[in-house]
Amino acid sequence: MQINFEPMPNSVTHLENNSPSRLKNNKTVEEHKEHEPDLQTQSEMRRESNGSPKDTAVTNQNGDQPHENVIHTQIIKKDNPFFNYMQDNVDGSDENGKNDDDDENAKNAGSDDNEDQLLQPNRRKNSKERRRSSVATSKDSSPDVPYNTLNHNASGMTKEGKKRAQILEASKVSEGQGRTYIAYAIKYGDSIVKRRYSDFESLRKVLVKLFPISLIPPIPEKQSLKSYGKAMTYSKSSYLLPTESGDSVDLSLSVINGPVTTNDEKLIRHRIRMLTSFLNRLLKNQEITKTSIVYDFLDPNNKNWNDLITSSLTISSLPKSVLQCNPIDPTNTTKAHSYLPVPSSSTQLLASKDNHSASDADEFTKIEAEFKNYEQLIHSGLYKYSRATTKEVNYLREDLKGISSEFAQLSTDETKNESGLAELLSHSSDAYGTLQEILETLVGNLHYNINEPLSECAHMATAVRDLIHYRRLKLIQKDILERTILYKRGQLIKFQQQENDHKQIDNMVKEELGTNGAVNLENPAGPQSYSGKFINKFTQLAIIIKDSVSYQEQDPAAAARSLEKELIQLDETLKVATSDLVVISETLKNTELPNFIKERDEELTQIFKNYAKYMKENATRNLEIWKELHNRIQEA
């Protein structure tokens, strides 16, 4: 396909490839449990904070004032989407005024501090270095657990070594006269470009025309600008990523990975994730990346995407309907494609159902039904019940938090009596508090790594059904052409028959008129015989018929010639439609559908593995807590 989009250079800035399965100093995830406070340490902290139920601001060991609703999610390097960003800050510390000639101990200490920041981004190591942000959570809030996209890591590169796009923030932009829109800052490589939702929508429409038989990933549904803009207005800086000059990686500041408190904020995050997935799926598509359209979309030099599209001769020359494009190369659409009918009425769609061949009904009709069933199973089945499970786990977390608080209050009351029951109640309070923290992490994992990927799988199934529906419309298109040709041929036979009838009538009239072509219609002087009267009546009737044929009906000969030319054009168009249908069917069966099924199976496998992993980790940690509580009760 030749498209007038110049591809961007293939130079890729070398980024350090940090394996997600390993941490600094070759420490595994399990070895970093030392960064998590043990049950005893948490017990001491909780005794101080829960000593009086009315005291909400209690100073902790570091001199901070812990907030009751602050998220304390343990983030390891493997799950940290900003690891590469922090690594760049560490490597470029000389730009911040630090001395590169520090001794080895200072370097090691700095490395440990940075590592601790990555592992526990929501905890302040030094109050003079950065200020801790307080984030209030509610029933709908979720801990900051990043969404691990398949085949992507946190360094901005895919496993294949290709760059990936990342939406850094969503901000409200004014375009004058009181009109505003939401702009998404997209980082690709070393460049950042801002695009609005209509730009994403326009890009997808163009891609559907340029690649009609390729699976184009979906984008999130268009939402009301009023509600969406309102969410952005009141979000302020709490939902923007850290600035480039910042030395903090506090995920609570991120619209992508931070905790959320309202449904509007969830909407913002959901749209950012869906649009990010849309761009990265396009960058993985080999057919689409052969052209430069996606790279032009990510190029900051093209500030106005709409102007670029409207000024492109390639895009403007495409037919309005994708059904009139050449499916192999829409930029090389022939004249015969312009004569293809565009099925628009529901009557045509319903009438075509009973006229398809048995083989087609057994093949693609069955495939479409299977994908429809798959979409329903994912969206109305797994996704629905997974969301319900996450909601119930979150409710359980809140209940455990309340139980922990009540045990702490009872422990305080029993302390006055100087009985051993106070210590047992304190241990129980600590255990329930730790359990709710574990469930907090589980809720975040289920929401971001299970629910949202399942929702994306359902949307991808919808895109596949749209592709199958396109093939079905092409089949209806071919059916309409066949019906039209049959009708036109019937009309041609009718006109040819009329022309023959007219010739016969003319011959009969000429025979009756005689060689001079005239007849005396006046009454003769003498009486006429019966045969003479009959001939006169027949002559008058023949003249009337000839006049009526000449002045009331279309010339059969001219109509027949016009139909013959039209049938020639229709036959050529039918050949094109038949050829297109064969190409579309083969591409869907042999390429697009198998590739989608393969990717779908990989994504679902990863989702189910994550689900089993999170549940196992939660159960293991629960068992450890209850065993530790049991041992303390036995010792008491």
Curated annotation (Swiss-Prot):
Tell me the segments the record calls region Disordered: 1-68, 84-163
For biological process, the GO terms are:
autophagy; protein transport; retrograde transport, endosome to Golgi
Q: Where is the composition biased (Basic residues)?
A: 122-133
Q: How does it sit in the membrane?
A: Peripheral membrane protein
User: Compositional bias (Basic and acidic residues) at which positions?
Assistant: 27-49
Which residues are recorded as binding a 1,2-diacyl-sn-glycero-3-phospho-(1D-myo-inositol-3-phosphate)?
196, 198, 222, 271
GO molecular function terms listed in the Swiss-Prot or TrEMBL record: phosphatidylinositol-3-phosphate binding
- Protein origin, superkingdom: Eukaryota
What does UniProt give as the signal peptide span?
none
Keywords, ordered alphabetically: Autophagy, Endosome, Lipid-binding, Membrane, Protein transport, Transport
> Which GO cellular component does the record give, naming just one?
endosome membrane
Any idea where the PX domain is? 160-305
Give residue spans, biased composition: Polar residues: 10-23, 50-64
Which parts of the chain span the membrane according to its record?
A: none
- List where in the cell it is found: Endosome membrane; Preautophagosomal structure membrane
- State the function annotated in the UniProt record: Required for cytoplasm to vacuole transport (Cvt), pexophagy and mitophagy. Also involved in endoplasmic reticulum-specific autophagic process and is essential for the survival of cells subjected to severe ER stress. Functions in protein retrieval from the endocytic pathway.
Q: How does the record comment on the protein's domains?
A: The PX domain binds phosphatidylinositol 3-phosphate which is necessary for peripheral membrane localization to the perivacuolar punctate structures.
The family assignment reads: Belongs to the sorting nexin family.
- Protein name per Swiss-Prot or TrEMBL: Autophagy-related protein 20
